Amino acid sequence: MLRRSLVTACVVVPGVLSAQQPTVSDSIHPHGDTLTHAIELQEITVTAAPTRREDPQAVITVTPTVISRTPATDAWDLVRQTAGVEVHLQGQGPGFAPTVSVRGFSSDHSTDMALWVDGVPINEPVNGHAEGYNDWNVLMPGAIEQMEVIKGPSNAKYGNFALAGAVNVRTIDRMHGIQGSVEAGSYGRVDANFLGGFDQAHWGGALALRYQRDGGWRPNSEYEVGQGNLRYVRDLSPSVTLDAGVGVHLTDWASPGYITADQFAAGQYDTVANTTDGGFKRRGQERVSLRVLANPNLLWRTTAYATQGRWQLYLTIPPEGGAGEGSGGQTEEEDTRYGLGLTSALTWALSRGQVTAGVEGRYDHSDYEKYFTTDRARDSVDTDLAAQQVSGGAFAQADLDPIPHLRVSIGGRYDALGTSTTPVGGLEVSDSKGIFSPKLGALVHLKHLVSLYANVSRGFRQTDGVIRDPSLPFITEWAYEAGTKLDGKKWNASVALFRADVSNEQSFDPITAVSTSGGQSRRQGVDLDLRIQPSPALGLTTAWTFTDAKYQQLITEDGDTLSGARIFNTARYVGTAAIDITPPKTTVFLRLATNVVGPYTPFDLPGVELPAYALVHLTGGIRFGSLLLQAGVRNLFDQKYPELRAGDFVSPGQPISGFGTVRYVW
């Protein structure tokens, strides 16, 4: 069924148009956004992902070299291994968006993190499952050219849902050659990829295709994924560039459901809540971008996009309150949506810096239905409504060097959102609101190797439940950051102290979908990042975040006071570390990496703290001419860990698994 859907989508979707995504620091250059790929298997070397050094904020750039050397299974896995960001899977299929945790923000389905791909926002407003639903699964690792991870809300180019920060992804737009790869692994995993393209100086393109099938390590957890990403770029003149493309994501999955904490402790992972649980997702996006260099100092860029999607989920929800309490039962959720958007920005190059000013607008429509079901047969209606949102924003960002060794960034944005919802057979309810978010930062170079920086900014996001009650207020934060960046010839490091004061804090149980909002919280801590490359044959990287995250004032629907308690699902520390080894003058490489999650309080269990755990992954490879062979083991020591825990229920993490990959380049 999925294979037929993928073929149909590729045939009926016309030659659709795609956009270029502005980077955090947009420089004016006639071909500054046209990144050319030549697929060559040269002598393997190690290159660490650098931290952006010139910005008064914490930004990590994941480069093409790093991407090509990282054995990531999916886009979220790529971020987890390269950017010091912790990711937790929901464990119920690839249509379930994972939870990204950054600086103590770990909301359900990554709704505190803004994700942009080629100028298109991925977060979904007016989503009945989770407001700002952010599905990393729609990204193809093999199609990614570059990725920037921006911690905190300090950049004016990102508005709604950027409480924890933003991730800006640019896909490959043109390249030379063709490559194909096939991966086989434990539990019946097969992952086939194709990447090819052309580059004729003033025009080019790239096509990426992926088919993935996995039998699942738990009963009733098999899935299929089909993806495609096509881009076409043409220089209409020396100063005008057109970028066109389309992306398609199709997936079907079965869900094993959650198990109790006692079953998890006993290793009883084979329990299946309901063999009819599962779902599907279909998503497409089209975009067109025009880039005009009006003069050597003025760049204009505009992007128009459209998105379409349908998502259906059958999932047995455990009884509220814990095992054995209440009846629980299966529910069906269905979300059918479409959206349109436009962004436009001007960048002026000055003698001492640059200024960017722009506007953006989008329209999103969602038909959301939720039913109580028995083995997929509908018993009664919980929710049936149509919702729409019109939003607009204006932003300006100036990055100036008023004197030598000093960078000042000042900016701000204003966002206005109008949301309306109409239950079937009911009356329309609507509300409009706006918010201004100032941004200010500075960086000073004390010496060639040392920089100090600080910033203060405001961020916001919409609250879960807006699709039913548009009058709900924004979740807002004031964020503060101060740090240092250190640079050497073969190493770089950064240390950042951060604090975020959040108003209208929300606690959301991802299993029961019960939310509590209206309180306050504070997140504060330190980020540490170190990357050492003593030789082309050896690379060492590590990134850690230590967080003290507590509710300052919050009362749940049950009347429990959470003031002073740790914020749910927020670890005291998270960290990553990796060693990359390549013997000199060989085509062999070895990578040993670990992800560490410190103690944390699960959802709806204040005062309870789960123990820390660490996952270790080992990967190696060798090249023979145009052939690259790669093999590895994930969760090398078979660590037992929970991907998600809420109350008495657990989604267990995957045990040890192996894989092997064959890649060939033409």
Where are the model-predicted features located?
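N-terminal periplasmic "start-of-domain" segments of outer-membrane beta-barrel proteins
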Residues: 38-76, 95-99, 229
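Transmembrane beta-barrel wall of Gram-negative outer-membrane proteins
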Residues: 186-213, 218-256, 278-299, 350, ...
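Short acidic/polar hinge/loop motifs at secondary-structure boundaries
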Residues: 120-151, 169-170, 230, 471
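Gram-negative outer-membrane beta-barrel transporters
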Residues: 403-408, 417, 499, 517-604, ...
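Conserved C-terminal beta-signal and adjacent last beta-strands/turns
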Residues: 8, 247, 396-398, 454, ...
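Short strand-turn segments of transmembrane beta-barrel domains in outer membranes
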Residues: 154-156, 165-198, 209, 214-218, ...
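Extracytoplasmic beta-strand/coil segments of soluble accessory domains associated
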Residues: 76, 80-124
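Membrane-embedded beta-barrel scaffold of Gram-negative outer-membrane proteins
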Residues: 194, 299-317, 445, 451-457, ...
